[in-house]
Amino acid sequence: MADKMQALGAQLTQALQETDEFKALKAAFATMKEDDATYKLFKRFQQIQMDLQQKQMAGQQVTDDEMSRARDVADQVAKIEAVKTLMDAERGVNALLNQLNQTITQPIQDIYAG
């Protein structure tokens, strides 16, 4: 049974890559990456987010300075058109994945609703 699930997962991976949403995300990322300054700022933003998340997960308090720095970088990133396009594309893929997750988990929801 696990092999069947793995095979279905591989098929879903392929199907996802063929969707317009995924293609838009891939193109938006490539466009954003072409501008070196934008890409570096985007990577910095990702790193700051990851650092803050890890700190919170470890039960550590995020300082006001860290939050201020994160907001500053987020504000800079949000003003860049290529990043806005990337974020829109991410929302499209996330919506698709949320729909898929609902479909997959419906039998589990049915068990608890029953």
From Swiss-Prot:
SUPFAM superfamilies: YheA/YmcA-like
Pfam families with a match to the protein in the record: Com_YlbF
Domain of life: Bacteria
Species in which this protein is naturally found: Levilactobacillus brevis (strain ATCC 367 / BCRC 12310 / CIP 105137 / JCM 1170 / LMG 11437 / NCIMB 947 / NCTC 947)
Protein name: UPF0342 protein LVIS_1488
Family: Belongs to the UPF0342 family.
InterPro entries noted in UniProt: Com_YlbF, YheA/YmcA-like_dom_sf
